[in-house]
C-alpha cells in the first residue's frame, strides 16, 4: 500500500504542520507551494493521496482537481479549506474529490480520511493488477480455446 501524501497549500505554516503530522503518523508527505508545482511532477509523482487547499493564488484547488482529472489522474483527492460552504463542497464532490474538510479540522479526522483514501487506492491497484493478469492469460489462449470460452 502506498503511504505517500501530496500536500498542496500556499500557506507555508500549514504545509509544515501537515508535513510534521503526516511524517509522525507514518506517512511519506511531499509538499508543494502551488498547484502548478504539483502539476509539473504529477505525471511521474509516486501514487498516493492528494491533500489540497481550495484557495490558492494562481490555480485554485478545484481547478487543480479539474486539470488532474482531464489528464486521467485518478488519485484520491482531499480538499481542505478555511472558507467552506455548501455550494463549494457540492462543487468539489461533483469534481470527483474523495472528501472535503473545513479548517480547522481534527488531526484524527484528516488522518482517517487519508487512510481511507489510500486503502481505496490499494484496492484499485489490486483490481487493476488482477485484470492485467487475466488479460495476459486470455492473450495466451488458442483460437479454439477462445471459441470455447465464448
Language model feature labels by segment:
Residues 132-150:
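Helix-turn-helix DNA-binding segment
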Residues 85-87, 101, 105-114:
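C-terminal output helix
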Residues 33-34, 60-63, 84:
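Acidic catalytic/metal-coordinating carboxylates
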Residues 6, 45-51:
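Active-site beta3 strand of CheY-like receiver
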Residues 56:
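Receiver (REC) domain active-site loop signature in two-component systems and cognate sites
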Residues 53, 81:
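Active-site residues of response regulator receiver
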Residues 37-40, 62-74, 91:
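Short amphipathic alpha-helix used as the core "switch/output" element in two-component signaling
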Amino acid at each position: 500500500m502506498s503511504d505517500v501524501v501530496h500536500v498542496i497549500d500556499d500557506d507555508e505554516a500549514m504545509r509544515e504542520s501537515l508535513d510534521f503530522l503526516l511524517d509522525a503518523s507514518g506517512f511519506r508527505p511531499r509538499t508543494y507551494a502551488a498547484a502548478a508545482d504539483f502539476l509539473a511532477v504529477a505525471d511521474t509523482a509516486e501514487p498516493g493521496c492528494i491533500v489540497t487547499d481550495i484557495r490558492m493564488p494562481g490555480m485554485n484547488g478545484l481547478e487543480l482537481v479539474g486539470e488532474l482529472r482531464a489528464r486521467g489522474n485518478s488519485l484520491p483527492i482531499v480538499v481542505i479549506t478555511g472558507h467552506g460552504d455548501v455550494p463549494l463542497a457540492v462543487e468539489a464532490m461533483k469534481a470527483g474529490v474523495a472528501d472535503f474538510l473545513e479548517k480547522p479540522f481534527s488531526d484524527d479526522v484528516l488522518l482517517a480520511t487519508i487512510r481511507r483514501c489510500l486503502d481505496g487506492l490499494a484496492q484499485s491497484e489490486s483490481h487493476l493488477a488482477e485484470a492485467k493478469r487475466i488479460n495476459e492469460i486470455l492473450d495466451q489462449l488458442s483460437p479454439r480455446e477462445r471459441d470455447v470460452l465464448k
